[in-house]
Structure formats: C-alpha cells, structure tokens
Amino acid sequence: MQKKIIKTIIFFSLFFLFEKSYAYININQGQQYEKKLIQNLTKIKQINIKKKIINAESFYIQVEKIKKFSPSLYLKNESTYKTILKWLKKNSNINELNEFGINLFQMKGIDNYGNVKITGYYTPIVQARKIKKNNFKYPIYSMPYHLKKNEPLPKRKDIYNGVLDKKYILAYSNSLIDNFIMEIQGSAFIDYGNKKKLIFFSYAGKNGWPYKSIGQILINRGDIEKKNMSMQAINKWFTKHTNKEIQDLFEKNESFVFFKETKKKQVYGASAVPLIAQTSVAADNSIIKKGSVILLKIPILDQNGVFLNKYEMRLVIALDVGGAIKGHHFDIYEGIGTKASILSGYYNHYGYAWILNKK
C-alpha cells in the first residue's frame, strides 16, 4: 500500500474507489470506543475480549515466510513472534495476552475513539496474449526509461493513443478495465491461455502525472451517489456504458503505471516477504513499523458485503505500504483472483487495532 518489489501493490492499492481515500465512509460501519484516545498508540493493561483468533495457522505460516525471506526483519521481531506463537499454542485467550509478557497498545483510530479504517486489496489475474489479435488489443507497457531521463512521460490519454513505441508492449489484454485495475493494484498474474503457469507482472514505475480517483469523478458527475459508492457500483456503471465512455473516464486520471515481468511465483510486499492472504496488511510505516504484529477486530460481512454487526479477531503483520495508506488505516491483503477481488471491493469499514510486542 518502495513498492518496486512485487506488490507495490500499494503505492497504488487504491482499489475500492480506485483510490483508498474513499469518498464515503459511514462511521457507523465500525463502533465507538467510550474513552477518547489522545496518542497514536496508548499502552493498556488488558484487552477484554474473549473471542479466539481465527487465523492462527496462517499467522504461523506468515512468520515462517518472514524468517525465510527476510532474516533481518525476523530478528528485529523474533521475541515478539515467538511469544505470540507460544500464546497461540497454549490457549490464545486474548484477555491473557499480558500474562505472556506482551505489551498492548491501543490505536486511537481516525476519530480518537478507536475506529481504524479497514480496506482490502488483492492480486488480479489478467487474460493476455503476446501478440495483438482479435479482442486482445489493449497494451500492457513496460517502463520507457529513456523517456524518463530526457523528457516528461506521456499522460494516460496519449499512451492510449499509441504515443509509446511498440517495443515497450509486454502483452495485450482483452479488457481495458482489467488493465486499469491491474494498475490500481500495482501488479497481476498474467494468463496467456496456453495452460502454462501464470506469469507475474510487477510494478516497474509510473509516468509521474497526478492520480485522480475515478470513483470521485463519478460522484462529482452525479453518476453514482456518494452513499452508494463501492467497487460493485463502479462495475455496474461499466456495464451500462460503452468502451469509449469508459476510456474517456479513465483518461481523466492522467497517472499511468508500467510493469515488468518477473520470475517470482508469490506475491511480495514492500518488505520483500511473500504475503499470506488475510494475515498481512499494508500500513503507514510512520506509525506502524514493518514487521509489527497487529491484533485486528474486523467487521464480518455477508456475501453481499453487508455488515452483520459481528466481528472477528485476526492477527496480521505489517509487510506492505501504500501511497494512499496513511494514518490509522489498514489495507488487508485478500489474496489472488476473483473471490479476493470481491472481498477487497466490499471492505470499507471500521474496526479496532492493537499493536503487540514483547516487553
């Protein structure tokens, strides 16, 4: 949410409104903390919650990934990781965390009453071909480095109009929308339709022009009501408009993202560690250090994205960053493909967060 590394994903993980600045957020999608919190992190003695952690196994796997792929990050947090794993193995009663010598820090949230923003991002799978043919006519570009040194890179509209040399084309997809979403997410797996392994395209750079949220544009134009804005609402708008109208909308966002083919087969965050779905997050590293363990109280949604007035407790690790992930905001990595895209599109809610570390 440095992101040159595979999920730069979030220099541009601006997905929900195609920007994580979200035009509309209802504070009632979270809950109110009774006592006002002043500091970013307030040390507390105990978390009075009896629910169990639902992702203990995934948390263990994520810690092992850190140990293997970033030994230095693991060493910085080794005591915390080992203590939390010991706690999970014994009983994982949240109200007993302090008995294991773990410091507990309540985050003040965006409103000073504990409400932190919860959103999601994912890795898309894009159908593409090496050669332009039939519906596969939308170029995915590599970074034109020679232009970057000598002159400003073209705006999105100019790139759509073919101003870049064809030698920079990595592949052709069959959907301009998929290309745009790929840019927003910062990376994607490419399916060439040959029954071979998917190829990972990671973030290579951008053209340097300012990003503009298409969700906000649609709200400003009155195409979608502010209260109804969601990824699903944007998709519905797409189905009712022509390719030309969709392209015109995209062109209002002059920012453009370039990619590079990589040999890596896992999705990495800014910490150079493979991300485990629903156990890794992008966070603001001016508040949350990379490798930090966060206990999240997350809203539970139904299959239509409706908040059920229930919460689940999940342990996550801050392994990613994002240009739009600022302050008391966590962007949860949801995984790869369609199911992950739906879930990440629904999350625009509030929860609670506690930072855990060994005393």
From Swiss-Prot:
Catalysed reactions, semicolon-separated: Exolytic cleavage of the (1->4)-beta-glycosidic linkage between N-acetylmuramic acid (MurNAc) and N-acetylglucosamine (GlcNAc) residues in peptidoglycan, from either the reducing or the non-reducing ends of the peptidoglycan chains, with concomitant formation of a 1,6-anhydrobond in the MurNAc residue
Gene Ontology molecular function terms on file: hydrolase activity, hydrolyzing O-glycosyl compounds; peptidoglycan lytic transglycosylase activity
Pfam entry (one): MltA
Any single biological process term in GO: peptidoglycan catabolic process
Annotated function: Murein-degrading enzyme. May play a role in recycling of muropeptides during cell elongation and/or cell division.
SMART domains named in the record: MltA (SM00925)
UniProt cross-references to InterPro entries, sorted A to Z: 3D_dom (IPR010611), MltA (IPR026044), MltA_B (IPR005300), RlpA-like_sf (IPR036908)
Name of the featured protein: Membrane-bound lytic murein transglycosylase A homolog
Protein origin, superkingdom: Bacteria
GO cellular component: a single term: outer membrane
UniProt-listed Gene3D superfamilies: Barwin-like endoglucanases (2.40.240.50), RlpA-like domain (2.40.40.10)
Keywords on record: Cell wall biogenesis/degradation, Lyase
Coiled coil start-end: none
SUPFAM superfamilies found in the cross-reference section: Barwin-like endoglucanases
EC number from the UniProt entry: 4.2.2.n1
PANTHER family on file: MEMBRANE-BOUND LYTIC MUREIN TRANSGLYCOSYLASE A
